[in-house]
A protein has these predicted regions:
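Glycine-rich phosphate-binding loops of nucleotide-dependent enzymes
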Residues: 2-516
Length: 516
């Protein structure tokens, strides 16, 4: 694109035929985050990068994008040694990154967001008409349909992601790093994204695709590199990969990916919502006349794009948000707006979405967190006054062993545990109460594939015991794997409910966007 007086100047440079990272080492205090990792990307390919939390994926890509600097090793672009000092440096070398959590300003338009941080040949004046025209040109080339004049807050999640891609392309990115790009997309939006990625690859771009969804990796990538404990396990052509093989490479042992559920033996209703309404944190409608029944011995999955009332639903049931209309009953008793302690006393357990905020107290020990809400129970106290710490530690040690929680001791502060082990601790605590009703909100978000496997097994075991489980998840694969019934939420309402028996994924995706 020629640079005229009225244009913003894109900073990207020429095509990247090859990018190679060799012997990359990165140390943090007490941690070897990257241990002589080799990784390369070629023009025209989609290279998937897999690994559990802490495997080194983020560290490696942050070094490629200039956020970290390697202690040892070399980066070469088109066979020329290259030092990337900052994200600006990375952009100038033709490297763009699409973060999992979009870096957009909601109140600004598409064109204004794309122009942020760019240099103008007119000093402080930005000719947004020129930016908009270039955005439309790129949109046509790569089928990234978006109106440059719309504010970001009016766009769907999939459209916001297109803006992120457009911004990188506008800056001249020849290589794109995509971090968990499908995490919050509907099935239809995933299909649209994959068409865009394939077109970018066909046009000569190199793409790094970071994901934990193995079936998507197999569908979209040409090669796969797996990291474990800061080291590269292997790089193989995707044509030679299978889901079990990739999972075993990630974890170091065989992983159960498919679950054989026992036949449904549903019992009486344990939880019922009748026309429940509630306000969101912004004072707008969060829930709109939601009705739902949950029976003992079944898992009901709540599917939907994030922000469509799932959080409000969980909080209304668990006494953390006021129900403004309608009723909530547990085992036939009206518990509408009952306090959490009262709900806990009648057998309702809750695995919260934000485990570090609502699930644990970071400065408390593992043992102290294990007995949260139960610290006054007769089995842990004398006359409900003096706590029996030996009994608390004994119970906690049994839970650590049963739930395979990795911790140095019961006295270790929770803040030092990994996300997966914190989630196992919350799960152990909630299930130790033998609940009649379990609300599980995003139970595997941000945890490793090994911990995910364990949590899924525990939920299915709890189902078979007769517990009524409400599973709220943004991961449609998780919903489909565990649920007996699936209800879809959109704009605070339940817009559809299906029995999970060869469910039509496309139909679910349509419901998630408000279709019928």
């Amino acid at each position: 694109m020629s640079q005229t007086e009225n244009q913003l100047l894109p900073t990207g440079h020429a095509r990247i035929d090859s990018l190679t990272m060799s012997g990359i080492v990165k140390r943090f205090p007490g941690v070897l985050a990257a241990d002589e990792i080799d990784f390369d990307v070629r023009s025209g390919e989609i290279h998937a990068l897999l690994g559990e939390n802490g495997a080194g994926k983020s560290t490696l890509m942050k070094m490629l994008y200039g956020l970290y600097h390697p202690d040892e090793g070399e980066i070469r672009i088109n066979d020329a040694p290259t030092i990337i000092k900052s994200p600006i440096d990375a952009i100038q070398h033709g490297i763009g990154m699409i973060h999992q959590h979009f870096m957009l300003v909601p109140s600004l338009t598409v064109a204004e967001n794309i122009a942020l941080g760019m240099k103008s040949s007119r000093g402080f004046q930005l000719d947004l008409d020129v930016v908009s025209q270039r955005v439309l040109e790129l949109s046509d080339i790569y089928n990234l349909k978006v109106d440059p004049h719309l504010p970001i807050w009016q766009l769907a999640v999939g459209e916001q992601q297109r803006v992120e891609i457009l911004r990188a392309l506008y800056k001249g990115a020849a290589l794109l790093i995509l971090d968990e790009p499908t995490a919050v997309l509907t099935p239809q939006e995933v299909d649209g994204l994959f068409r865009i990625l394939n077109q970018l690859a066909a046009d000569g771009h190199g793409l790094v695709f970071i994901s934990h969804k193995l079936h998507e990796v197999l569908e979209i990538s040409h090669r796969v590199t797996v990291l474990r404990d800061g080291r590269r396990v292997n790089t193989i052509p995707t044509s030679q990969a299978t889901r079990p093989k990739l999972a075993e490479m990630m974890v170091g042992r065989p992983v159960l990916l498919e679950y054989e559920k026992n036949p449904l033996q549903a019992r009486d209703d344990r939880l019922a919502l009748q026309d429940v309404s509630a306000l969101s944190n912004r004072g707008t409608t969060g829930l709109d006349a939601v009705s739902l029944q949950l029976r003992g011995g079944e898992i009901v999955g709540i599917a939907g794009v994030s922000g469509n009332g799932q959080q409000e639903l969980a909080q209304c049931i668990t006494g953390l948000r006021e129900v403004t209309a309608g009723s909530v009953t547990v085992d036939g008793s009206d518990v509408t707006n009952a306090p959490p302690a009262a709900l806990h006393a009648i057998g309702l357990s809750y695995i919260p979405e934000e485990r570090m905020i609502d699930g644990v107290i970071k400065e408390f020990s593992v043992a102290e967190n294990y007995v949260l809400q139960d610290h006054g129970h007769p089995k842990y106290t004398t006359a409900r006054i003096f706590m029996l710490f030996n009994k608390i530690r004994q119970a906690c040690r049994r839970a650590i062993q049963q739930f395979e929680i990795k911790t140095p001791s019961t006295e270790t502060l929770v803040k030092s545990l990994s996300g997966g082990n914190i989630q196992k601790l919350v799960l152990a605590r909630e299930l130790s109460r033998d609940p009649g009703v379990l609300i599980a909100a995003q139970p595997t978000r941000g945890v490793d594939i090994g911990a995910t496997e364990y949590i899924h097994k525990q939920l299915l075991e709890e189902r078979d015991k007769g517990t009524a489980i409400l599973l709220i998840s943004e991961d449609l694969d998780e919903i489909r794997a565990l649920s007996d019934r699936i209800a879809v939420m959109y704009e605070g309402r339940i817009v559809g409910e299906v029995v999970n028996d060869n469910v039509d994924v496309e139909q679910l995706g349509l419901l998630m966007t408000g279709g019928v």
